[in-house]
Amino acid sequence: MSLSRLHIDSFRNIASAQLQLGDGLNLIYGQNGSGKTSILEAIFFLGMGRSFRSHLSQRVIQNDQDKLTLFAQLEQGEQETKIGLRRYRSGETEVKMNGEKVKRLSTLAETLPIQVITPESFSLLFEGPKSRRQFIDWGAFHTDKSFYTAWANVRRILKHRNQMLKSETPYQQIQFWDKELVRYAEIVTEIRKRYVGSLNERLKGIIEEFLPQVDVKVSFTRGWDSKTDYQTLLQAQYPRDLAAGHTASGPHKADLRLRVGTLPVQDALSRGQLKLLVCALRIAQGKLLKQQIDKNSIYLVDDLPSELDARHRQLLLQQLSDTGAQVFVTAIEPAAIMDSLNTPPVKVFHVEQGRVTVIE
């Protein structure tokens, strides 16, 4: 699976670009501020309906325009899918797939499994559990069709339960919703647990390549005491939840724990090793996706030379190549990437002041 064409209009500093893409490694180079990262961001926006650089989508629309337009052609075997997205400054979004309107952004995410490795993505190990839950849920969403419905119901019921807690609703009226919450929470938790187990198996070999002699243990915590029945816990914690105005325990508190011996990886590994660990996690996800549903991820790797030394750049690029995925890599100087490749990239693009040129 790969993107064969990408059209960008009024996105960041790119007024207009029409790109024919390679199905393997695509190298995009240019000075800081040239617009090279905007190409990655446009691909991400097309797959997720949002930016990985800003929570305010209006910021990606060019200053003198009222909308941005993105279009891509996706090829998987003999199947061809055309995806179009238009975002207005008002916040309205129009999405079409093969000419038909798409109502849910999750349809985009399902169609384009995108993995991002940027300087900011290394916060996966430093921030709170939310980013690690999102990491788990990316894989659960793509590999188990029942996950999204159960996850959406957990979110909906938790929101309603928290509103009732803020309104000081008696537990007798909350009890029905707790039963529903427990039902969907158990589905979400089982899928997450199973996914992390499968991911761990794929991760071991990659970590051996990236971090030899480092034994990283990965475990999943579900968000409440595994020895306690969730229904019983919700009832027992009702007074505390009522006082706090929100639900303290549940699948919304799940986490992915990574340790070396008894220490969290943040305390046991150097910054460089942690960067490699995040890369290993992303590659393991891509390989597991291919194994379980025979679908490749699309990797967006921003500013690779500044994050890893030459040897580890070469190792990462080789691992990405081994996945069979389409990869987009940005750099200031092309030599920093070219020197790390065993085979030349499929396509090379130069970006300068928002103008994109193909380098033959």
From Swiss-Prot:
Gene3D superfamilies: P-loop containing nucleotide triphosphate hydrolases, RecF/RecN/SMC, N-terminal domain. Its main location: cytoplasm. One of its GO terms (molecular function) is ATP binding. The keyword Cell membrane does not apply. It comes from Shewanella loihica (strain ATCC BAA-1088 / PV-4). It comes from the Bacteria. GO terms for biological process: DNA replication; DNA synthesis involved in DNA repair; double-strand break repair; SOS response. The RecF protein is involved in DNA metabolism; it is required for DNA replication and normal SOS inducibility. RecF binds preferentially to single-stranded, linear DNA. It also seems to bind ATP. HAMAP family: RecF. SUPFAM superfamilies: P-loop containing nucleoside triphosphate hydrolases. The keyword Zinc does not apply. One of its GO terms (cellular component) is cytoplasm. Belongs to the RecF family. This is DNA replication and repair protein RecF. InterPro entries: DNA-binding_RecF, DNA-binding_RecF_CS, P-loop_NTPase, RecF/RecN/SMC_N, RecF_2. It is found in: Cytoplasm. ATP binds at G30, Q31, N32, G33, S34, G35, K36, T37.
